Amino acid sequence: MNYRVQPTAQVADTAEIGAGSSVWELAQIREGARLGEGCVVGRGAYVGTDVRIGNNVKLQNYALVYEPAELEDGVFIGPAVVLTNDHNPRSVDPEGKQKRGGDWEAVGVKVAEGASVGARSVCVAPVRIGRWAMVAAGSVVTKDVPDFALVMGVPARQAGWVGRAGVRLVERDGEPGVWECPQTGALYDEKDGALTERAV
């Protein structure tokens, strides 16, 4: 075994965990879940059945990732974040009978490469969090988030752009639609509500 699982964690026999990953106390990884290499699953975090997680992903303490979520490489899920999976949640059907597993269809949240979801945020499925986007702490995401977008609030709304470093981008003086990372100097172009990286 080339990964670490704490004794109080529960990992299903059919789950796959990549090399160099760590699963901390009281975490639960369900049947068929697949985690890539170098992942960290924090204390009390939950990974649902058949969830797909890429390499170098961090799930902080008490994050809840319900199936059929998909997290690409380099994703950060903050403490107590919830990725939901039921668009019309009910305990009972219209006749008052308790709903069972086959009585509803799970829908997932997709989090693209490098994106971050801040502490105690809720992503209401089905939504996609774009590449390198950032969801501010405490937000409720009900719509897709564009690549590199910074969103915040309830419901979450775009409040700017961020680069790969996670720092808010600044629009260059005299160059409308050209954004720069103050930390790395990387340049980005905005067109029709989308942001793209300039080739280096």
Regions found by a protein language model. Name each.
Residues M1-P7, S22-R128:
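Flexible, glycine/small-residue-enriched loop-and-beta-strand segment within the central core
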Residues N56, Q60, G96-Q98, V117, ...:
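Short Cys/His-rich Zn2+-coordinating modules
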Residues Q158, V167-V170, L187-Y188:
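Cys/His-rich microdomains that often coordinate metals
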Residues Q158-W161, W179:
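Cys/His-enriched microdomains
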Residues G163, C181-T184:
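Short cysteine-rich clusters marking metal-coordination/redox-active sites
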Residues E171-V178:
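Short linker/helix segments within small regulatory modules
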Residues L187-V200:
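Short metal-binding segments enriched for Cys and/or His
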